[in-house]
């Protein structure tokens, strides 16, 4: 039975005192033997951590003490081993780096689509489906009908939009990512660029894999995750990939 709970979490929220939050957050993580990395910025919090059930519950309880973080978005999966080596709380300019000033998902964002409704949306031929993740993530798994922007980092996404998407041509755009945070910013960016009907998968791929039965799923392959598991399968269990020691990209011995 899996011993560790892996918790991916984020929330876009005004945290003017984010620098002051760093130490008490580090303290609660260390006290409860929670490993992983959390990012703090004036726009919110983001990261993935792992611990025992009790440790993760203690962290979530700590968030509830701050009314700004009581409804932090989180998704859980499990691993037999601790997938992280260290405990880190970092201060950043953005909790997910797009590099474009003024994009604020708290003020404008696309339409959330529940996992149970996602299949019907992306099967619609009038909907242009974009995977907002990096190229190496997409190579090991993505949704049917999805376009690969072939980006190496999220910073390249605005350039992809500028060169390849047109509000007059692409009337309906649906986007997805691992846990939902990149889609928050990417849909906010598209709305700012004049796109009207913009949708994104609520809770990301991880929530979809959790809620949609595999026999009904339009997901193909495995889902890359930013921890020692490298990828998870449709049951959210560690997949067949490992990390190449030379290039640091996911590899598999499977035929």
Swiss-Prot record:
The keyword Transferase does not apply. SMART domains: RHOD. PANTHER family: RHODANESE-LIKE DOMAIN-CONTAINING PROTEIN 7-RELATED, THIOSULFATE SULFURTRANSFERASE/RHODANESE-LIKE DOMAIN-CONTAINING PROTEIN 2. It is an enzyme of class 1 (oxidoreductase). Keywords: Oxidoreductase, tRNA processing. NCBIfam families: PRK00142.1-4. HAMAP family: TrhO. Its EC number is 1.14.-.-. Gene3D superfamilies: 3.30.70.100, Rhodanese-like domain. Catalyzes oxygen-dependent 5-hydroxyuridine (ho5U) modification at position 34 in tRNAs. Residues 123-217 form the Rhodanese domain. This is tRNA uridine(34) hydroxylase. It holds the Pfam family UPF0176_N. The active site is at residue 177. It comes from Photobacterium profundum (strain SS9). GO terms for biological process: tRNA modification. PROSITE patterns: RHODANESE_3. It catalyses: uridine(34) in tRNA + AH2 + O2 = 5-hydroxyuridine(34) in tRNA + A + H2O. InterPro entries: Rhodanese-like_dom, Rhodanese-like_dom_sf, TrhO, TRHO_N.
